[in-house]
Design a protein with these regions (language model features):
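Double-stranded beta-helix
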Residues: 15-53, 189-212
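Generic, low-specificity signal for short hydrophobic/alpha-helical stretches with a mild N-terminal bias
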Residues: 6-9, 23-24, 134-138, 160, ...
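Intrinsically disordered, low-complexity segments enriched in polar/charged residues with Gly/Pro
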Residues: 1, 130-132, 140-141, 163-165, ...
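Short acidic/polar capping segments at secondary-structure boundaries
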Residues: 30-32, 159-161, 181-184, 193-196, ...
Length: 232
């Protein structure tokens, strides 16, 4: 798969010189859709011939209200710095895009205001989610803000195979983007060295597991990929 960024005002076209189908997904940013917002499909043998057009969906963008979590390790930045409206004294997480039953986003405005995100997805249908979601029976993405004022628990998330077999859930890869950080902030991701099962169990029991984890100092703008099965 390839992606191309096309700045405003740049002439461009899509051409296919092969006998195989090419799938192109065009994403535009703007308030309105006009006749210029079209994907034009050229005939490979005669580029000047009349072309087919595929018009973008004119449905409005659905703005969401987050679901909040009052985790004990949380702080107040999600409300005080980022302006999220929540009455919790401490906010650990703000689930901005979520169809997970443990905390669903809600439609923020318009005809479906107040509706749970999962209910809204049932109305608009799978086709509106893009071709990569067609084979899945639930919305697969969760986007959240985390305010970690204190250390979180050490965790390992399963992959799809294990999670579907044992929990009827999808596995969980994570991508962390550090929006802001205090001096000396760090994350744990993966083991710093090889360790036996017996050593890991012993360190879990005596609360020294972080001694063999990979400690990563972070600053605003850093990105960390945490694949399923990685201790963090």
């Amino acid at each position: 798969y390839e992606s191309v960024f096309i700045p405003v005002g740049t002439k461009h076209r899509i051409a296919n010189k092969t006998d195989k189908n090419v799938v192109v997904i065009e994403v535009g940013i703007g308030d309105n859709i006009s006749d210029t917002d079209l994907v034009k499909i050229y005939n490979k043998d005669n580029p000047q011939a009349s072309a087919n057009y595929v018009r973008l969906d004119k449905s409005p963008i659905a703005k969401l209200e987050p679901a909040f979590k009052d985790n004990l390790w949380g702080g107040t930045k999600i409300r005080d710095v980022y302006g999220k409206k929540c009455d919790y004294d401490v906010i650990g997480e703000s689930w901005e895009l979520s169809a997970h039953p443990d905390g669903q986003s809600r439609i923020a405005e318009g005809r479906y205001k107040g509706m749970l995100f999962n209910e809204y997805l049932n109305i608009i249908g799978k086709e509106a989610l893009g071709w990569k979601c067609q084979a899945q029976d639930r919305f697969p993405i969760l986007i959240k803000f985390i305010d970690a004022k204190q250390a979180l628990s050490i965790q390992i998330h399963p992959d799809d195979e294990y999670a579907l077999e044992n929990e009827n859930e999808y596995g969980k890869n994570e991508m962390w983007y550090v929006v802001d950080s205090e001096p000396g902030s760090y994350l744990y991701c993966g083991l710093s060295r090889d360790a036996s099962k017996e050593e890991i169990l012993e360190r879990i029991n005596n609360n020294t597991i972080t001694d063999i984890l990979n400690k990563i100092e972070v600053k605003a703008g850093d990105v960390v990929m945490v694949k399923a099965g990685t201790i963090h």
